[in-house]
Regions:
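Short beta-strand segments
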Residues: 99-101, 123, 150-154, 234-239
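Gly/Ser/Thr-rich loops at beta-strand to alpha-helix junctions
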Residues: 104-105, 154-159
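N-terminal secretory signal peptides
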Residues: 1-14
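Active-site cofactor/substrate anionic-group-binding motifs, chiefly glycine-
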Residues: 102-132
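Short acidic/polar active-site loop segments enriched in Thr and Asp
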Residues: 147
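Divalent-metal-activated hydrolytic enzyme cores
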Residues: 11, 20-26, 32, 44-91, ...
């Protein structure tokens, strides 16, 4: 990498103590760069293949949880997106593949403090799977080496509300039909209405759980990778009000 981007004790940007602290922190996690697992005081950079390949699925999930904690505390990593763009231009080695909703308030890279090159992100209303999505996830995990496959829903999801209300609109009708099984499978004692946010959020969670199950059922490629321990398929819910991402056990 171009030396003009590198920090050293002599550059004046950092005191010697802080520089050594940063270097020691990076060594402690077994990497010298990469935005996903660097210590909080270090600057972010693009993941390399060597760095990604050393990570376990559990470490990647832990890193995403820590990133969400930083997002909620307002202490996100210092980023130079131009630097990340240049560092990742010759190749990409994302650690995870995500299936998330298109909702503008739930951008995974932002809410988990991730950078360019950290993840693949498939976005579709209601975070539902289909053959094209499955093919994309298979590419991400089997061919490109991602080690975590995360399905993330969110609270107050408009697609969930539409499925509950049996909304119909062009091609959206068919998409919402994929969510209706989650509506039907949700056990709820209160008002089963799109106006009841507690019910909407309960359905959204069930939808994530069923999507995870469908991915395992409909993608032998991903199911085999998980059975071998090469990847972990998990679900999560993002809370629009609190900013917290809850990973399912």
């Amino acid at each position: 990498m171009d030396s003009k981007f590198e920090h050293t004790p002599a550059c004046g940007c950092l005191g010697r103590r802080n520089f050594l602290k940063m270097a020691g922190a990076a060594t402690a996690v077994g990497i010298g760069g990469g935005s996903l697992l660097l210590a909080e005081e270090a600057r972010a950079d693009a993941l390399t293949k060597e760095q990604r390949d050393k990570l376990t699925p559990e470490q990647i999930i832990k890193a995403m949880k820590k990133g969400n904690k930083r997002f909620r505390s307002g202490e996100r990593k210092e980023r130079n997106y131009l630097r990340e763009q240049k560092a990742s231009a010759s190749g990409q080695y994302p650690a995870a593949a995500l299936l998330t909703c298109i909702d503008s308030r739930a951008p995974a890279e932002v809410i988990m403090d991730l950078g360019i090159g950290d993840i693949f992100n498939c976005r579709v209303a209601g975070n539902v799977e289909n053959p094209d999505i499955l093919g994309s996830l298979e590419f991400a995990c089997k061919l490109a080496g991602a080690k975590v496959m995360l399905v993330m829903g969110h609270t107050a999801c408009g697609a969930i509300k539409g499925a509950i209300d049996n909304a119909e609109l062009g091609n959206l009708t068919g998409l919402l039909a994929k969510i209706k099984p989650a509506v039907e499978a949700t056990t709820y004692a209160g008002e089963r209405s799109a106006k009841n946010y507690a019910f909407v959020n309960t359905v959204a969670r069930k939808n994530v759980e069923m999507t995870v199950a469908n991915i395992r059922k409909d993608s032998p490629v991903l199911a085999e990778l998980e059975s071998k321990g090469s990847i972990e398929i998990v679900g999560a819910m993002y809370n629009l009000e609190t900013g917290a991402a809850e990973f399912f056990d």
